[in-house]
């Protein structure tokens, strides 16, 4: 008789972070205030369920600003945009709300500040990721992308007297540390951020997987294929020696994954809503799991304020003009 899973161990923390919460709320409140449609440049966050849910509410997701009609309301995604995109959007006269995660904006501000002081940059990140494109697009030149240690050996900055390193916020903490060490070894005078650019939520979710993986036979990560931080969670569990799969929904779970498994670890990327975690939990319980246990973990209480003009009382629909700090229950 094949053994079925007996216990589900839930990573803590998991799922939505403050930047994702804020980005989704910006789109929802813009629709509430201005009416549908609201245009969003790129997926607001990299999650299929979230994007489809917002589409149903009246959001239209576009990649090219030419696809947005004159006078429309436009939201920039949580990943941030380049200066060129921002300037083009302003020139086209859109009503713009910026849902860029404040921790990504922090990197943009640092790049702009140091560039004025004559710095060049080495950026650690994944080529083609919208966050990387947005950060590199803060300057016309002088940012060199490296994806691995081998790239560090090949990079050729114009000068090394003033050189700084920045990173994509959703990288593997361990990979970023290894690449940063290689940068430091080649350019000993390189300036590093006062605080690492990898965000608190990425760090916390990876730390939770490090605790989770050794205690289970299988790790399931809830997240979409385009989600960088979700992919890093799956890779991390595998690197720790635990078989791991990533699913966009409960329907993607395969029965054969659970053969011979007694304890399943479950986590979710920072853009994956808790409703998907519950659906995956229910599916695993249907396969035989009889208990669900939450791990001890860090409680995240960070909440980022909304842009001016979108602080709306949910009960009355009226704009809130004075409310500090912005408070409310965590999403999911």
Give, region by region, the residue ranges found by the protein language model.
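The feature marks the mature, well-folded catalytic cores of soluble enzymes
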Residues: 1-268, 274-332
């Amino acid at each position: 008789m094949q053994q079925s899973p007996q216990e589900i161990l839930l990573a803590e923390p998991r799922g939505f972070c403050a930047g994702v919460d804020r980005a989704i709320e910006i789109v929802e409140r813009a629709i509430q205030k201005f009416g549908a449609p609201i245009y969003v440049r790129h997926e607001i966050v990299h999650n299929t369920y979230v994007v489809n849910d917002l589409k149903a509410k009246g959001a239209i997701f576009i990649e090219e600003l030419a696809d947005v009609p004159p006078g429309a309301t436009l939201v920039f995604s949580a990943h941030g945009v380049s200066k060129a995109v921002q300037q083009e959007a302003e020139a086209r006269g859109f009503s713009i709300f910026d849902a860029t995660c404040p921790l990504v904006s922090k990197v943009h501000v640092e790049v702009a500040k140091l560039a004025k002081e004559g710095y060049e940059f080495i950026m650690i990140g994944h080529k083609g990721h919208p966050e990387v494109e947005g950060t590199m697009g803060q300057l016309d030149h002088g940012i060199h992308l490296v994806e691995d240690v081998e790239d560090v050996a090949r990079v050729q900055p114009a000068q090394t007297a003033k050189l700084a390193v920045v990173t994509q916020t959703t990288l593997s903490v361990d990979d970023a540390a290894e690449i940063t060490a290689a940068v430091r070894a080649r350019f000993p005078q390189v300036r590093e951020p006062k605080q690492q650019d990898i965000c608190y939520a990425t760090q916390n979710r990876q730390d939770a997987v490090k605790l989770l993986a050794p205690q289970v036979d299988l790790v399931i990560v809830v997240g979409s294929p385009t989600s960088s931080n979700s992919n890093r969670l799956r890779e991390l569990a595998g690197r720790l020696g635990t078989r791991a799969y990533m699913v966009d929904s409960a329907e993607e779970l395969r029965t054969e994954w659970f053969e011979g498994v007694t304890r399943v670890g479950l986590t979710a990327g920072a853009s994956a809503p808790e409703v998907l975690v519950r659906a995956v939990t229910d599916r695993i319980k249907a396969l035989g799991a009889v208990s669900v246990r939450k791990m001890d973990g860090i409680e995240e209480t960070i909440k980022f304020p909304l842009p001016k003009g979108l602080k709306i009382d949910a009960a009355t629909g009226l704009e809130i003009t004075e409310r500090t700090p912005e408070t409310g229950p965590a999403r999911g």
